[in-house]
Amino acid sequence: GDGALPAVDVVIAARDEQAVITRLVEHLAALRYPSEQLKIWVVDDASSDRTPELLAGLQQRFAQLQVLQRPADAGGGKSGALNTVLQQLQGRWMLVLDADAQLQNDTLERLIPYAEAGGWAAVQLRKAVANAEVNLLTRAQAMEMALDAVIQQGRLSVGGVAELRGNGQLLRRDALLACGGFNEATVTDDLDLSFRFVVHGQPIGVLWDPPVREEAVLGLGALLRQRQRWAEGGLQRFFDYGAGLLSDRLKPSQQIDLLCFFLLQYVMPVLAAADLLGAALTRTLPCIWPLSIVALGLSGLAIVRGCLRPSEGPALPAMNPLAMALGIVYLGHWFVVIPWVSVRMALLPKRLVWAKTLHLGEDHEAAATA
């Protein structure tokens, strides 16, 4: 019965989220879960728009909503906001959401038993793009999210490592505290925390359904800014946790998984870019590109596999040769972003820039002009 369900804290770090915060809190309050076991925490991270007023109004309506204010000079980015609230939590589980997240009503009553039964320290929900039909770029991101979930599940199935994705990550509070909370010296709290969990022997699971819905960015500039941050944080953590990852705390299968992941995601794009540059300068044919083309081809097949899987939430993009080609061409952006970020990180000192992604809710027109 309900008595068996543990206490859950749903946590959102919100900065300037007036477009989506009301919808989010209303949806969370409607989740099917024992009301005395569910608290909603919103950290208003020095918002300069109407977010604080909206939250004050929502607190009048929803008793389970707790709002924390954070001053503008608090520092630590999203991790700092999450650490602020972490000190006050008492629930067994902490579900971290972005302000643009949308959950099905049955999410918690399915997710929590899955996490408990599997013995997971954390579970990442599959991310599903809510605005896939807006343009080709949002459709490609919907494919990429399905691809990512397929790859994460595949890595787990061969004894590898699954990773947290920030939005829709369920964390067991005692495991999180044992890992030292959120790292405030990173631009990607989720990728960093994934390695903290791995190094501390805390297993991370992945759940295909129910998914968490989120907005894909609408334009190329916003995409490249977002991906630059992901690439920087993703690469930085290999240096931050390198010693732990190489130690005997990890199973050999996990170390092999991380090595393959590092070679494919970071080394190969850098080599491919250098190879292409060298070929252009010497007017010869590039030699590493066949490998890159095979990798992109396999990614294309994984996209098809993911998008054809039965799924709840927003419909995944229909699959045909043209759609697969779009997905593969789109993935090529990593072959630009990764080398660029790698060179910049090698030459410039570490600098922390939390580039906030704009969440629009239903207002896509505003973004087209932004």
Show the residue positions of the predicted features:
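N-proximal low-complexity "stem/linker" segments adjacent to membrane-targeting elements
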Residues: 1-26
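Acidic donor-binding segment of Leloir-type glycosyltransferases
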Residues: 26-72
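Long helical/loop segments within the catalytic core of UDP-sugar-dependent glycosyltransferases
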Residues: 62-71, 75-92, 105-187, 224, ...
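Acidic donor-binding loop at a coil-to-helix junction in glycosyltransferase catalytic cores
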Residues: 187-193
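Catalytic donor-sugar/metal-binding loop of nucleotide-sugar-dependent glycosyltransferases
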Residues: 194-212
